[in-house]
From Swiss-Prot:
It holds the Pfam family Cytochrom_B_C. GO terms for biological process: mitochondrial electron transport, ubiquinol to cytochrome c. One of its GO terms (molecular function) is metal ion binding. This is Cytochrome b. It comes from the Eukaryota. Heme b b562 binds at residues 84, 183. The gene is MT-CYB. Belongs to the cytochrome b family. Binds 2 heme b groups non-covalently. The cytochrome bc1 complex contains 11 subunits: 3 respiratory subunits (MT-CYB, CYC1 and UQCRFS1), 2 core proteins (UQCRC1 and UQCRC2) and 6 low-molecular weight proteins (UQCRH/QCR6, UQCRB/QCR7, UQCRQ/QCR8, UQCR10/QCR9, UQCR11/QCR10 and a cleavage product of UQCRFS1). This cytochrome bc1 complex then forms a dimer.
Amino acid sequence: MAPNIRKNHPLLKMINSSLIDLPTPSNISAWWNFGSLLGICLLTQILTGLLLAAHYTADTTLAFSSVAHTCRNVQYGWLLRNLHANGASFFFICIYLHIGRGFYYGSYLFQETWNTGVVLLLTLMATAFVGYVLPWGQMSFWGATVITNLFSAVPYIGQTLVEWAWGGFSVDNPTLTRFFALHFLLPFMIAGLTLIHLTFLHESGSNNPLGIMSNSDKIPFHPYFSLKDILGFMIMLLLLTTLALFHPNLLSDPKNFTPANPLVTPSHIKPEWYFLFAYAILRSIPNKLGGVLALAASVLILFLIPFLHKSKQRALTFRPLSQLLFWLLVSNLFILTWIGSQPVEHPFIIIGQLASTTYFTIILVLFPITSALENKMLNY
């Protein structure tokens, strides 16, 4: 029998074992589509970003006008910019749903896969932040000023750290230049981390909606899930192009269409929608260092999730009390996102403080207690 090149070629056999002959649980639902959708998001962002970078000038006097020039004079430059800006939103929608799926079905018990995923989230957040500064509009400039200033809360070395990040005594040309360099570099770092993430995932195989061992019922990835993924790509790309063509500025801040002016502070500085939950937690503590620690904890808490798992069952599929808590947490995150977009005044301050407290309480206290209670209920 002739050797099968797909299974014997050094490169093709890696692709084969990851995308073609990969044994996959037969019952995984559409919630398992978001991993591949994130891959498509990354690819789209790198392609549109590369083409935008060809027309961008990383200089404070030219950055804003170079973006305007791209939109007005470059063939389909407006489309590239709209796809890239809204592609970032879709990236975050997909990653939040992907994390939510992992949380709901207990996928975090694949600890290496989960931890590399959290590192990927942090890298994505850093990439989005430095990218938002590049158009050099009002919100770009003041967002960069406010967020980089948070490093000054670090005891003893804080101020030095901020000036080192800025490359001077304020956000200026050196800051923009280095942010552009970082924004170009980080997506490739994300691509590398994704390969590590997949390597760890394929060591254990995918989890499934029942949260039980599925070795006795696996099917090949291709054609079953490759087709399912392609359907996902089509739906997501349709939604992305619809947003980019019909409502390109729906999710962006109008203040960013004004060139950066260090002498005029916007009345209400806020980041893009995907950072608002963390921004609300940061603002809910009336102390700089405390706020920064809470901000860091709001994302880094994900590293603790595997250690807080006390249930005898893996997924939440058959755990109604924990399901209730999960949806409370989701609702709470929506409230935090809304609060982050509001000015710092009554009643938003107290709502933000309550929602921030609830966020940490649900994850650190209520989930483990409820799991223990459900374990007890299994005995009756």
